[in-house]
Amino acid sequence: YEHDHFFSGCLVGPNVFAGDRFVATRRLKDLRSTDTNDMTPDPLRGSYLAVYWWLENTDEETNRWNVENVNKLHAQGRMYAERDHVHTLLYDMKWNVQREPTGCTIDLALDHGYPGLVVVAGDVAEGHTHAEVEAWFKDTWLPDAMSKPWGPELVGSGTVIPLADDAPADVVRAAAGPNRFLQLHFLDHDSAEGWEEGYARIGAAMEASGLAHHVWTAPWQQTNFGTDDYTDQLR
């Protein structure tokens, strides 16, 4: 299913120009934040993550193709109903920051082959704005994090694009609303390195800022395309 769907689910569609796939082995799942949230009620669920980039200003066309295509794949029996489908959502990339000015840019991130990835989700606190949260990350959290060995090389942050009403029934309708943001932190090292010093504390830092509420933080690693590597390490 993973080998088929990585391409047939999105990558062959219009406007989609990059994709990458990540896995969470048990050692990484054990590092996930465990607070109750609307994304992952069970912290041990969700072993694979596929991420795709598509061209800006093509959301309606691309989303329409995705819905019709996945419904077709369902009809062909190619959606592997036995899996746990934990979270699918579209995000509009609003900003990004890279550690090195001449380093990898966000449009090339999924082709770069970063060995580690951390997903960070949060909600803007009542009375505050996405712009304030962006400024806090850019001015406070990221400069410090990017100076540390555990820190990211590149970060992209997006806001929610609502799913189509006729999206497949097995796609979980997350409670995420307009205050939700989701960030992808790309690492040039194992995402478990320095976890307790670094990403284990990002939720508390977000809450302490008064600008955002922490939803979920989770580390991932690259899959090895064309193999079943890591399937024996998921639980």
Language-model segment annotations:
Residues 2-235:
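Macromolecular interaction modules
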